[in-house]
Amino acid sequence: MIINFKNHFLIAMPGLKDPLFKNSVIYMCKHDNNGAMGIIINKKIKNLTIQKILHQLKINIKSSNTLDFKNPVIIGGPILEDRGFILHTFKKKFTTSTHISNDLSITTSRDILEYIANLNNPKNILMALGHCIWKQHQLEQEIAKNIWLTTPADIDIIFNTPISEKWKKSMYSIGIMNILQLTSEIGHA
């Protein structure tokens, strides 16, 4: 039986050396017998904001909109790095929305950007370019090799925690207060 990690965080173990995944937190959008898909939520793209994306797409922002459009766009992963993925808590259905949980959806269509730009007070938006994928059983093998820790996702960490604190706060959420005590060695009883 496969454990389903959809709507969970993957938290990189401290020993992970790959610069993209080092100290990363990945929100898992999909996980089934065919593989898995997730979005890194704590690696920002330098000098790219939601405002710049909207400007490039010629989408005007309503003047009364209170969203901080200077929020950074996130590096979602190494696959399809030119494609946008928006995690959000809107109940509205967009052209390409997928509900991941009762509270959270992911959308890849332009209509969500137009919707966000015209709201008065949009909240709970994380925009990423790219995503991560794992082929069949690859994620389970990586977890067994102690590359990732897992925990149910926390919306507060996704949307309200500063980017630089998401990895540490995710570790704290599973009771790991002293990260230096972790080892990537696998124990055997």
Swiss-Prot record:
The entry's cellular-component GO terms read: cytosol
- Top-level division of the source organism's lineage: Bacteria
Cysteine pairings via disulfide bonds: none
Q: What SUPFAM superfamilies would the database entry show?
A: VC0467-like
Q: Which organism is it from?
A: Buchnera aphidicola subsp. Baizongia pistaciae (strain Bp)
Matches recorded under InterPro entries: AlgH-like (IPR003774)
Quote the NCBIfam families the UniProt record gives.
PRK00228.1-1 (NF001266)
For this chain, the family text in UniProt reads: Belongs to the UPF0301 (AlgH) family.
State one Pfam family annotation: DUF179
Official protein name in the record: UPF0301 protein bbp_491
